Amino acid sequence: MTKEEKNEKEALIEFFSSYRELFEFFCSNTTIHGAIRLVCSRRNRMKTAFWLVLFLVTFGLMYWQFGLLFGQYFSYPVSINLNVNSDKLPFPAVTVCTLNPYRYKAIQNDLQELDKETQRTLYELYKYNSTGVQGWIPNNQRVKRDRAGLPYLLELLPPGSETHRVSRSVIEEELQVKRREWNIGFKLCNETGGDCFYQTYTSGVDAIREWYRFHYINILARVPQEAAIDGEQLENFIFACRFNEESCTKANYSSFHHAIYGNCYTFNQNQSDQSNLWSSSMPGIKNGLTLVLRTEQHDYIPLLSSVAGARVLVHGHKEPAFMDDNGFNIPPGMETSIGMKKETINRLGGKYSDCSEDGSDVDVKNLFQSEYTEQVCVRSCFQAAMVARCGCGYAFYPLSPGDQYCDYNKHKSWGHCYYKLIIEFTSNKLGCFTKCRKPCLVSEYQLTAGYSKWPNRVSQDWVLHTLSRQYNLTDRNGIAKLNIYFEELNYKTILESPTINMAMLLSLLGSQWSLWFGSSVLSVVEMLELVIDFVIIGVMILLHRYYYKKANEGEETTVVPTPAPAFADLEQQVPHIPRGDLSQRQISVVADITPPPAYESLDLRSVGTLSSRSSSMRSNRSYYEENGGRRN
């Protein structure tokens, strides 16, 4: 095989020698519509220019659509899917509070002193006299509050007053003219006394309740957290309890004390044994929870709670009872029926929404013994900020081990710190609402309430007579009835799903590609091949230029040395011959003059003819010799 044949043999991988050759091959063989028009009409420059512009515009529009699709995909939109299911439903937890804060014996004296100071304040500011509060001083005496007693006394403040207290004479004169424009509040200062402000209110009722609440929280910090509610208090509050037409047992509820809403009892919250939780297989009042509650107001704190009845909250089994957020009150002397509808929301996590699966990815420590919720996180965040800023914790929220609740006997300026922290908290300067994300899976209960008078006139006598025999109760305003049930077993499930997933994105991209070029995935591969070949040709051109330039630089800088004459050594080796002996030793040179060969005989086409002539001559010669040199 000659060298030319070896070069003509097809190689395993071949590359184009120029961009023009690559472009012409691609346009002539690609499956992309319109590309062949760029080379088939090259003799007509106008057509070539038209198809080139059309091809580029179409290409640009397609990739503009691609950009829109990718932008929509990477914005991670979600679609809402609503499913309606019907099945046996687990009954939620129900917490009921008395709406009467209890007087602990450990702080009984402190609460009595607070009541006396409150009555002095009411008489001094509003000339109110009540004999229903323990320790009341007769109204015929001039009441002056002892500033050596409780700190942070209530004061009347003129409009615009922020840092000073107005004298009593000025107050009495001005109140006769513009009573509505005056505010009431109490002064709070930091530890050094250099930073002070008034916590003011336009309503005297709100101011007195908040002032009383502030001191009550301070006193409550001295109560041991292990203080339990005895069984006698439960029987005095809940007269009857039935679920699914069966009586409740002590295993069905747990109790705790709330500083504002009093003694609270939670039904159906047995986190240790989920098998004992209630469930409803039928809708209706008979298949729900029915409670008969006492709503009398005896031996409680009237200045802290001004509402009669009971506080109710429906929540999840593993969620804490935040009575001040989602709870509602039921009135005394009425039957309140609460119908429920369950709704489950399942959000997509990750890049699709800012939700948390279990709170482990949230930078806030959960202080509650419960599962993660947004409210749990927000309160834990506030408590952590208060402990860090004020040196003590809020009495309504749990603490980390080693921390203490706020008491102005130990923490003198905690009130000043607390009210300023509340302002930062509500304006999200603490960042709690930003840090705390919604849980991805949430179960909510949509509630509808109905009220009716209970007991009615016909049954009032015998119902109250029976209750008076058992519980010494004779007033219909001292009882209330509560029904909580499922209106229907159909529950909604709201699911989030990606609006554009990967399969849909590929489908949309393929649709756009087919719309603008009428091609397929193989056409995309051809485009990739074109790009790869383009890059390879560019690399080859650069390498060729590099090595060519390097070779030229080497030829210019290289100096070739002149070799020594080769005959020098020969002269030394040739022996000296005397001039007289030259005649005897002369060498005769005979030139052989031979004509050049006939190059016409080298013609390959005449090889066959010459060989045939030679063979003919040899045959004739042999014949002539055999016949003795005779010719025919």
Swiss-Prot record:
Residues 1-49, 542-632 are cytoplasmic. PROSITE patterns: ASC. Residues 612-622 have a biased composition (Low complexity). The keyword Ion transport applies. It catalyses: Na(+)(in) = Na(+)(out). Keywords: Cell membrane, Cell projection, Cilium, Cytoplasm, Cytoplasmic vesicle, Disulfide bond, Flagellum, Ion channel, Ion transport, Membrane, Sodium, Sodium channel, Sodium transport, Transmembrane, Transmembrane helix, Transport. One of its GO terms (cellular component) is apical plasma membrane. It is a multi-pass membrane protein. It comes from the Eukaryota. Residues 71-520 are extracellular. This is one of the three pore-forming subunits of the heterotrimeric epithelial sodium channel (ENaC), a critical regulator of sodium balance and fluid homeostasis. ENaC operates in epithelial tissues, where it mediates the electrodiffusion of sodium ions from extracellular fluid through the apical membrane of cells, with water following osmotically. It plays a key role in maintaining sodium homeostasis through electrogenic sodium reabsorption in the kidneys. Heterotrimer; containing an alpha/SCNN1A, a beta/SCNN1B and a gamma/SCNN1G subunit. Interacts with shroom1. This is Epithelial sodium channel subunit alpha. It comes from Xenopus laevis (African clawed frog). The gene is scnn1a.
